Amino acid sequence: MTVGRTEVTRGPTSLAEMARLSGEFAERHNLVYCVLWLTGELDIAAVREAWRGVCLSHDVLRRAYVSPDEACTYDDVLGEVEFYTADTDTEALKTVRQITTPFDLAGVGLSRIAIVQRDERRHLLAIVLDHIIVDEKTWNRLMADFGEFYERAIQGASAPDKVEKNAYHDFALLERHELSTAWGEERRAFWRSQTDRFGTFPPPFPIACEAKGESRLTAVHHALPADAKARVLDLAKRARATPFVTVASAVLASLQEVSGAPTVGATTPFHGRVLPGTADIAGLFVQMVPLQLTAGARRPLETVREVFSHTLDVFEYNLPLRSAGRLWNEELVSVDRQAGVSVTLDKRTMSFGESLLVGTKAEIVPLYVPGEVTWPRTLQFMWEMDGMAPRLSVYYNENYFPDEAVESLIQAAENFVLSTDS
C-alpha cells in the first residue's frame, strides 16, 4: 500500500464515522463491493490513473482514523490498484476473495481495487469499500467519476496532482460545530420528544416472539396486481404524499391491525444530506430512521397523511442517533435491540455500468462474502414496483417470527394498498 507522506490536516470525525469506529455494525463485515468480468480492451495504466483521480477528487477515500472522534486526511492516495494474473476463472475468483475481507479500522485506507487478468481481453475487476465511506449516492458518484477519468486517461490526460478542497473533512467540521449551536439544540429537543413519545430507537416488533433455535431466513413473495404501482401512485397523489410513505403506511397500518397495539413503528434507510452544501459530497450519509403510526381508526388516505407528516420531521432532523445521543448524553437508542420491522420501496443495489469503462463490457459476478447482516429479529418488507411484475417480498427468520402473524401482516398491507375505500 502506498501512503502519502504529508497529512493535509487532522479534524473531527463525522457522526457516521464515529458510530462505525465506536463499534456499531461490528457484527457484520460492513463492506460495499462490486465484482465483475470486463470483456474487451482494458488499459491497466488508465485504470490506475482513473482510480487515482477518483481518490484525489473525494477526500473521504483518503481519510484514516486516530480515534472515534479524530480523523486525518492525507493529500495523496492511500492505496493503488492491485494487479494479478490467473490461469482459470476459479483462480481469479479465489484471488478476489482474498481482498473482499473486512477492513482494519485502525489501519490506513478503507478502499481496495484489484484487477485479475485472465487474458488480453478478459479481466476480473473488484472494488471494495467500507460502508463508513460510501452510500448509494456516493457509490454512483464514484463510479461515474471513475468512468470519466478512465476515458480521459486513455486519451493521455493525467489525474490532477493537487486537491482543491477536502469536502468531507469540511463537512465533519461543520457537523460538529452545528451540533453545538441552535441547529443542534433543535435536533436534540426533537429527538428527546420523540423518545419520550415513542420510546428509544429502533421501534420494537409489537407482537411477542420467541426464538426457537438458530436463525433461519426465509422469503415470501406475493405477486401484486399489474396496476398496483398505479394504485400506489394514485393514493400518494390524493394524500399529497410520496409513494414510499404510502407503502410504509400500509405496513404500519397492518402492524396496528394485526397486533392491536395503539402505536407501532418501523424503520427505513434515509439517503439524505442533513446540512446545506452536502448534496455532492462523497461519504456515508444514509441513516436508519423511525416511522410511526399512532392510535385511531382511519381510512388509508388519512393514515398516509399522518405518516407523511411525521416523516417530514424525521427526515428533516435525521442524524446518527447513537453518536448524537452519546455527545448529548441522551439515551436515544437501545443498542441491544434490532428494529422490529423495516420497509423499503424498489431497493437499489450497488451497480457498475455495462460499459462504464470505454471499450469494455461489464458482467456482474454475484459473490457472497461471509459476515453479511442477516437481521434475525427484523421483519423486512420490500415493495418491488418498478418491474413488469410488481410484488411484495418479505424476509424474516422463521424460527423467531410466527408464520401466521407474518402472513396476516402481508395480507393486511396488501389490502391497504389495493383498497378502493380510501
Located regions from the model:
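Short amphipathic alpha-helices and their capping loops
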Residues: 1-25, 48-90, 109, 164-218
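Amphipathic alpha-helical regulatory segments at dimerization interfaces
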Residues: 49-57, 98-102, 132, 193, ...
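Extended, hydrophobic beta-loop-alpha segments that form or line the acyl/peptidyl-thioester binding
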Residues: 58, 62, 143, 262-269, ...
